[in-house]
UniProtKB/Swiss-Prot annotation:
Annotated gene: ligA
Keyword Nucleotidyltransferase included in the entry's annotation: no
Keywords, ordered alphabetically: DNA damage, DNA repair, DNA replication, Ligase, Magnesium, Manganese, Metal-binding, NAD, Zinc
Protein name: DNA ligase
Enzyme type, top EC level: ligase
Gene Ontology CC, one term: cytosol
BRCT domain residues: 598-674
Cofactors required: Mg(2+); Mn(2+)
Family matches, as SUPFAM superfamilies: BRCT domain, DNA ligase/mRNA capping enzyme, catalytic domain, Nucleic acid-binding proteins, RuvA domain 2-like
InterPro entries registered for this protein in UniProt: BRCT_dom (IPR001357), BRCT_dom_sf (IPR036420), DisA/LigA_HHH (IPR041663), DNA_ligase (IPR001679), DNA_ligase_AS (IPR018239), DNAligase_adenylation (IPR013839), DNAligase_N (IPR013840), Hlx-hairpin-Hlx_DNA-bd_motif (IPR003583)
Annotated SMART domains: BRCT, HhH1, LIGANc
Length: 674
């Protein structure tokens, strides 16, 4: 047997195993391998495919990792129009739809009317084409007639199979040997939160749907892969037997390896439909993803064809959207807050009201344009709303209830922190304070960001302490922190010798934080944690980074022209040389550490959690050992946790890990992996 034949057999076996474990992990939530073990299988496959490039195929699981750059997304025609559904916002409208369909079916002599109720995912609709079971095209809905070809990006979504089971496909597909699957790409709550945590405050997404829509149109499929999106399938076309009922098509999709949402139900009466809608009005909050309603579809596919569609939507389906949770309140005041980058954000102070299980007394108004759009005045009665995981917001002014003593809200003219005249750049919706170097609120914001957990992690440097340090003129930039003296700290409110010593120890410890973390801590506009990592690898010292041209920066992965310009502007500030001098004198890490040859990458891509006390390492050192070897350390257990290291007296996290089937290792086993 030749080497290439042996390699082909090994590759085929690895692909089957990887796809099986991918399905177990992402679709069935029943993982059999840790992230580390799964990555080892994938590494074996990638190694073999590199040795035998002639055996690499587009449907290989190795192609999920992304990396291709797509300069444009060509338009493609849909085989059948991808129509949007009619929306209903009341049970009455659902009943009208049900009765309308029943009358139309009665004209065809049909008495029984089966409807399939499915949860409505708040995602982005896409179409997938499989030729002989292999994914050959993935496209957005677009205008319904044609969409954008985003195949490379969709291949990175773990719950989209790249190859369908051959025997089953052969038995199901029609003469064209092409199956079309439609559904929604979405982002689970946990993945959405993780993505936002890695981004600067000003670049965070408002909700999972916005994050999904933006991610699918990125040109770098490697970045798309890092954003961990999911797919739910609800449409199957191209079958040998096109009379197959919809409920059976959902079952076939599951057999083909797709996630179908699991919670669909066949309903025979209007009462059963109303029960389903009422049941999931509350239960949906417990799901790991956002749903915003229920979709009802006629189960009988041939009769769907007879009912047809309007220009915009099918007559055989409807989407019922749950109303957002709302409450009435009174706008008592509007405060204008200053962010660390100078942006002025209006905040509504509301009469406290209970909404979605918590008391709400404040809500962001985003910018002054929003105040004008809502027509808000002080003392107005307003409707506030909470939908999904989104922060409560003011959605409507009750003009008919406006009191006689209502007062207009005047746009800000001067910074509420430093008094500097505000500016509103052309094409910008927000006012901003240009007094970057002297504005106390901006200085405080930059210091708190510098000390935050994902930056320099100076836990003793809290809001109240920073407020005092800035007010007394002891600190004007992060560099000043490292020159504080114990007597200076002891003079502050609620500060004794012990507290002062703790602060100085925390500052001393932060000097060891990596160059990558320092870059993030500096608070450069648009530079989040992921971008800081790319910068630290491409420019392994602060001197190399500040000497790089805008064109050079724009070629770094994850760095476009906007981010590149922001970096150039940051280092061009008059205050930068002084800050750099302080950071050098304080002996912070201004360059990446030389890679240690003996350090392996055994934890590459593995998410590790520590619980209990370790004998040989403190928690910080153990975490650094994982990070040095390519892993990631988290503070809570989930299905995506790759490994839990259990020390002495582990807490409830160990129980949760066992319940979820997460791999648990002892300190000895952990040390053996290093």
């Amino acid at each position: 047997m030749t080497d290439i034949i042996r390699a082909a057999e090994a590759i085929a076996q690895l692909r089957r195993e990887i796809e099986r474990h991918t399905h177990l992990y992402y679709v069935e939530a029943k993982p059999e391998l840790s992230d580390f073990e799964f990555d080892q299988l994938l590494d074996q496959l990638i190694t073999l495919e590199r040795q035998f490039p002639q055996l690499l195929t587009p449907d290989s699981p190795s192609q999920r990792v992304g990396g291709a750059i797509t300069r444009e997304f060509p338009a493609v025609q849909h085989r059948e129009p991808m129509l949007s559904l009619s929306n209903s916002y009341s049970i009455t409208e659902v009943e009208e739809f049900y009765n309308r369909v029943r009358k139309l079916l009665a004209l065809e002599g049909v008495v029984e009317q089966e409807m399939v109720a499915e949860l409505k995912f708040d995602g982005v609709a896409i179409s997938l084409i499989y030729q002989d079971g292999i994914l050959v095209r993935g496209a957005t809905r677009g205008d319904g007639r044609q969409g954008d070809d985003i195949t490379a990006n969709l291949k990175t979504v773990a719950t989209i199979p790249l190859r369908l089971e051959e025997t089953l496909v052969a038995a199901l597909q029609g003469e064209e040997r092409a199956i079309e699957v439609r559904g929604e790409v979405f982002m689970r709550k946990e993945d959405f939160e993780r993505l936002n945590e890695s981004r600067p405050d000003e670049d965070r997404f408002a909700n999972p749907r916005n994050a999904t829509a933006g991610s699918l149109k990125l040109q770098d499929s490697g970045e798309v892969a890092r954003r961990s999106m999911s797919f739910v399938a609800y449409y199957l076309k191209g079958l040998k037997d096109e009379s197959t009922p919809h409920i059976h098509r959902l079952e076939l999709l599951a057999r083909l390896g797709f996630f179908t949402g699991d919670h669909y139900r066949l309903c025979n009466t209007l009462e059963e439909i109303n029960t389903y809608i009422a049941e999931w009005a509350e239960k949906r909050w417990q799901l790991p993803y956002e749903t915003d309603g229920v979709v009802l579809k006629l189960n009988d596919v041939p009769f769907r064809e007879k009912l047809g569609a309007t220009a915009k939507s099918p007559r055989w389906a409807i989407a019922y959207k749950y109303p957002a949770q709302q409450a009435r309140s009174v706008l008592q005041n509007v405060l204008f807050q200053v962010g660390r980058l100078g942006t002025i954000t209006p905040v509504a102070e509301l009469e406290p009201v209970l909404l979605a299980g918590s008391t709400v007394s404040r809500s962001t108004l985003h910018n002054f344009d929003e105040i004008e759009r809502l027509g808000l005045m002080l003392r107005d009665r307003v409707i506030i709303e909470k939908s999904g995981e989104v922060i409560p917001k003011v959605v409507r002014t009750l003009f008919e209830e406006r009191p006689a003593d209502a007062m207009p809200i005047l746009p800000p003219t001067h910074c509420p922190s430093c008094g500097a005249p505000l500016v509103r750049p052309e094409n910008e919706v927000s006012y901003s304070c240009p007094n970057e170097e002297e504005c106390p609120a901006q200085i405080k914001g930059r210091l708190l960001h510098f000390a935050s957990r994902n930056a320099m992690d100076i836990q003793t440097l809290g809001d109240a302490l920073v407020e005092q340090l800035v007010a007394k003129g002891l600190v004007k930039d992060p560099g000043d922190l490292y020159f504080l003296q114990e007597p200076q700290l002891e003079k502050l409110e609620r500060m004794g010798p012990k507290s002062a010593q703790n602060i100085l120890r925390a500052l001393e410890k932060s000097r060891e934080k990596s160059y990558e973390r320092l870059l993030y801590a500096l608070g450069i506009r648009h530079v989040g944690r992921a971008t800081a990592r790319e910068l630290s690898q491409a420019c392994p010292s602060i001197d190399l980074l500040r000497e790089a041209s805008e064109e050079q920066l724009a070629t770094i992965p994850d760095i476009g022209p906007v981010v590149a310009r922001s970096i150039i502007d940051y280092f061009a500030k008059p205050s930068w040389p002084h800050l750099l001098e302080k950071l050098r004198t304080a002996a912070l890490q201004l360059s990446a550490s030389e890679p240690k040859e003996q350090v392996n990458r055994n934890f590459e891509g593995v998410t590790v959690l520590f619980t209990g006390s370790l004998e040989r390492y403190d928690r910080q050192k153990a975490s650094e050992l994982v990070l040095e070897r390519g892993g990631r350390v988290v503070g809570s257990v989930s299905k995506k946790t790759g490994m839990v290291v259990a020390g002495q007296d582990p807490g409830s996290k160990l129980q949760k890990a066992n319940k979820l089937g997460v791999r648990v290792v002892s300190e000895d086993e952990f040390e053996a992996m290093l």
